[in-house]
């Protein structure tokens, strides 16, 4: 589980806030304090070092948001990515926006373009380890504001199990983020029984975040 329930739900920096339901446009707003802890479970951390590790093998076909798009949509997606990049990489900017938006805790997870299920298993493992170490660093610096959801190389279930165990037991991750398919294969067809068993054994949350879609055959 992400948290244990208790009477003191607010983080140590003060009473918790809550954004009004009318704020659906993605804008930072000044919010009313209601005395309950607000947790945002859908928050990505981008790790530039992972980009560097992947730069020689990246292909547009491996980026569904860009590949399955017309030119106008692709242009928008790329501009949007650049717009949010500072907040996805700079913890101080992230914390400032959390405070302004009334978010007490973020469950941070990898940016979907770093799933890398299309890559060779060893490269996927290296990227996962790099990203998970960075997630752990950010959580360790602000343990009252962040919890971590790790990433694992699902293209190799054995490696995925090993990395999941390391991330949970050694790095303190509370869960794992995965894609809704593994390089086009449905989760039910990807040989993931050992992974699901390890998730159950470790009692961790599985956050399924789609990026692209299965082959459909």
Question: Which ranges hold each PLM region?
Answer:
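Helix-coil boundary/capping segments in enzymes
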Residues: 1-217
């Amino acid at each position: 589980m992400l948290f244990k329930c208790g009477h003191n739900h607010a983080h140590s920096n003060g009473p918790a806030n809550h954004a009004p339901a009318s704020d659906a446009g993605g804008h930072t707003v000044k919010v009313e304090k209601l005395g309950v802890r607000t947790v945002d479970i859908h928050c990505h951390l981008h790790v530039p070092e992972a980009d560097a590790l992947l730069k020689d093998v990246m292909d547009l076909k491996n980026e569904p948001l860009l590949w399955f798009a017309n030119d106008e949509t692709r242009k928008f997606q790329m501009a949007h990515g650049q717009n949010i990049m500072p907040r996805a990489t700079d913890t101080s900017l992230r914390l400032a926006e959390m405070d302004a938006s009334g978010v007490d805790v973020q469950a941070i997870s990898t940016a979907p373009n770093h799933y890398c299920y299309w890559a060779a298993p060893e490269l996927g493992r290296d990227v996962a380890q790099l990203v998970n170490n960075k997630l752990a660093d950010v959580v360790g610096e602000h343990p009252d504001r962040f919890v971590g959801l790790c990433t694992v190389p699902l293209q190799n279930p054995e490696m995925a199990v090993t990395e999941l165990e390391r991330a949970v037991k050694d790095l303190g991750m509370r869960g794992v983020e995965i894609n809704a398919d593994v390089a086009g294969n449905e989760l039910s067809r990807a040989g993931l029984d050992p992974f699901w068993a390890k998730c159950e054994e470790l009692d961790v949350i599985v956050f399924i975040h789609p990026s692209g879609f299965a082959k459909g055959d």
